[in-house]
Design a protein with these regions (language model features):
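N-terminal accessory alpha/beta regions
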Residues: 65-163
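Flexible, low-complexity segments enriched for small/polar residues
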Residues: 42-48, 52-65, 289, 293-335, ...
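Extracellular beta-strand-rich recognition modules
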Residues: 2-6
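Active-site substrate-binding loop specific to GH73 endo-beta-N-acetylglucosaminidase modules
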Residues: 26-29, 36-37, 110-117, 149-379
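Acidic/polar hotspots within intrinsically disordered regions
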Residues: 7-8, 16, 38
Length: 491
C-alpha cells in the first residue's frame, strides 16, 4: 500500500495511494504527512506512542519502526533529551564517496553539494542537528548562484552544525564572519570610508529582528560596525576559485579577515546604545533585544510546531500562539540566549504536545524527501540516489543551497501545488518500490505479520500501513477512501 508523504498528517492520495496494492502481495508502502484541505477528526488524547511519533516527525525526519522500538519504555521527556544529545559527531565515508563521485571532492557544483547534504540528512544519527541546519538555512538564506562555488555554502552549513543550537550571539558572529555570507551580501565592499548597508540591513530585517523593530539609522550604524569584516584578497581569490578544479589545484576558497584599517572607528548608535562599536558589539546589542527573542521564537514555532502566515505578514499579524512565543522568549533570556534551551522548552511544552498542532504544518520538500529515504533504509554506496533526491527537492521548489532570494522560502501552503504534489507522489513511489531496500523489506514484513489470524482485508491493510508508519492519524474521509480503494483494487 502506498501512503504518500506530504506533511504532518496524511493526505488522501486516492488511486495514487492504492494503485499498486495487492493484499496477497503488498507492493509498496510509503510514509506521508498531510491534511491539506481535510479536517482531522480525532478527539481522544494522544497516547505516548503517538506523541513520540509526533516528536520524531518534528525534531527529525520521522521515525522508522526500529527507531520507535529503540525508545519504547522511555518517558517522552527522555526521548526529547535523547534527540537533543549532540555530543557524538556523525561519521561518514566521505573518502569513498568522493572517489566514486569526483564532483564531491571539492563540491563546487550545486548538484554535488546538494547530494552531499542529502546523504548526511539521510544517514545521520542526530537528525535534529541536520533539521536545525535546514532551519537556519531557511532564515539565513545564502545561495551559491552568486558565489562561484557551492562549497562555501557547504562550509556555512558546517558552521550551523557547530553553532546552530548554542548561544545566538555566537551563531550570529559566526554568520557575520562566514565568507559565503560576506560575499553574498557584499560586506567585502563595506568600508569605513564608504559603507555598504546590505548586511547591516538584512541582519536586522531578516536574520534577527524583523521589520518594524529598528530604524534606518540603526541600519547605517550597524553597517558601520561591520566595516572591515571581509575576506582575504577577494578579487584574487575569486579568480583562483573560478580556475579551481578537482585536479591539480584542489579546493580553494575565500577566508575571513578583519581589516582594522578599514573599520569605522567613530561612535555609533545601535538600537539606542552608543559607543565605538564593532561587529561583535552589534551582535550583542541585537541579541539583547526582546524583539530578537520573539522573532527567533516565532520562526521556531513556524518550523517545528505549526505553519504561521508568511514572514512578510508578521509585522501586520500576530503569532498563532502568543503564549508559546512567550514561553520560548523567557527560556531564551533565562538561559543566556541559548537556542537549545528554547528547543527543549518547545518540545516539552503542552502547546507542542497538543493535538491541534500534531497535523498542523506541511513538510518542506527536503523533509519529505529525506524522511522517505530514511524510511526506505540506509543508502548503499556507491549510489546516485542522492543526486536524484536533490533534483526532486529543486523541482518541488526547494533547491538545497539555492534559495530563491535572501528571504529564503516561506513554506506552509506555498509548498503545495499541482506540480509539486505529483513530484511527491512520484518520488515516494519510486523510492519505496524497491523491495530490495532494507527499510522497505522491514515495512512489508511488519505489515504482513500484523494480520494475526491471517485474515487479509482492505480495512486491515489500511490500518496496518498507518500503524507501521507512525502511528499516524488521518481524517475519517481519508481513511474511508483508502479502504474503499483497497477493497476495490487490493485483490
Amino acid at each position: 500500500m502506498v501512503i504518500i508523504v506530504i506533511d504532518d498528517g496524511v493526505d488522501w492520495g486516492g488511486r495514487y495511494a492504492l494503485r499498486n496494492i495487492r493484499i496477497n502481495k503488498i507492493k509498496k508502502c510509503a510514509l506521508s504527512e498531510s491534511s491539506v484541505g481535510d479536517v482531522m477528526t480525532t478527539t481522544q488524547a494522544a497516547t505516548q506512542e503517538e506523541l513520540v511519533a509526533h516528536l520524531f516527525r518534528r525534531a527529525g525526519f520521522g521515525a522508522t519502526p526500529s527507531e520507535m522500538e529503540s525508545v519504547k519504555g522511555m518517558d517522552y521527556e527522555e526521548v526529547v533529551d535523547k534527540l537533543m544529545d549532540f555530543s557524538s559527531p556523525d561519521v561518514f565515508p566521505t573518502d569513498f564517496i568522493s572517489r566514486f563521485h569526483k564532483d564531491q571532492s571539492d563540491l563546487r557544483l550545486a548538484e554535488a553539494a546538494g547530494a552531499h547534504w542529502v546523504y548526511r540528512m539521510v544517514m545521520t544519527d542526530t537528525p535534529l542537528r541536520e533539521k536545525m541546519c535546514l532551519f537556519w538555512h531557511r532564515i539565513f538564506a545564502t545561495a551559491g548562484t552568486k558565489l562561484i562555488q557551492h562549497r562555501v555554502i557547504v562550509n556555512q552549513i558546517n558552521m550551523f552544525r557547530e553553532r546552530g543550537v548554542g548561544k545566538l550571539d555566537d551563531l550570529l558572529v559566526g554568520l557575520s564572519q562566514d565568507p559565503a555570507m560576506i560575499m553574498w551580501l557584499d560586506n567585502q565592499d563595506n568600508h569605513g570610508s564608504n559603507i555598504n548597508e546590505n548586511y547591516g540591513r538584512e541582519i536586522l530585517e531578516l536574520f534577527a529582528m524583523g521589520v518594524g523593530n529598528y530604524t534606518e539609522d540603526d541600519i547605517k550604524d550597524t553597517a558601520r560596525a561591520f566595516t572591515g569584516w571581509t575576506v582575504v584578497n577577494p578579487e584574487y581569490m575569486s579568480i583562483k576559485m573560478r580556475n579551481n578544479t578537482v585536479r591539480p589545484y584542489g579546493y580553494i576558497s575565500w577566508q575571513y579577515e578583519y581589516d582594522a584599517e578599514d573599520h569605522d572607528q567613530g561612535p555609533k548608535t545601535i538600537l539606542g546604545e552608543t559607543g565605538n562599536w564593532d561587529g561583535e558589539d552589534a551582535v550583542r546589542i541585537i541579541c539583547d533585544q526582546k524583539a530578537t527573542a520573539e522573532y527567533i521564537a516565532r520562526h521556531l514555532y513556524h518550523f517545528f510546531v505549526a505553519d504561521e502566515v508568511p514572514v512578510p505578514q508578521w509585522p501586520h499579524q500576530g503569532p498563532r500562539d502568543e503564549t508559546a512565543i512567550k514561553l520560548m522568549v523567557d527560556s531564551y533570556f533565562n538561559n543566556g540566549h541559548s537556542i537549545k534551551s528554547m528547543l527543549e522548552t518547545m518540545f516539552k511544552s503542552d502547546f507542542f504536545k497538543d493535538e491541534s498542532t500534531r497535523y498542523a504544518r506541511i513538510k518542506s520538500p527536503a523533509e519529505m524527501v529525506v524522511g522517505t529515504m530514511r524510511l526506505a533504509g540506509p543508502i548503499k554506496l556507491p549510489s546516485d540516489e542522492t543526486y536524484y533526491a536533490q533534483s526532486v527537492c529543486a523541482n518541488m521548489g526547494q533547491g538545497l543551497l539555492r534559495p530563491p532570494s535572501v528571504e529564503g522560502w516561506q513554506g506552509g501552503s506555498e509548498w503545495i501545488n499541482t506540480g509539486a504534489y505529483v513530484e511527491r507522489i512520484n518520488f515516494a513511489s519510486r523510492i519505496l518500490n524497491d523491495s530490495d531496500k532494507e527499510g522497505v523489506k522491514d515495512l512489508l514484513t511488519r505489515i504482513k505479520n500484523s494480520s494475526g489470524d491471517g485474515t487479509l482485508t482492505s480495512d486491515w491493510l489500511v490500518e496496518a500501513c498507518l500503524a507501521v508508519l507512525g502511528p499516524i492519524e488521518v481524517a475519517k474521509t481519508t481513511r474511508d477512501r483508502l479502504k474503499i480503494y483497497a477493497s476495490k483494487y487490493g485483490n
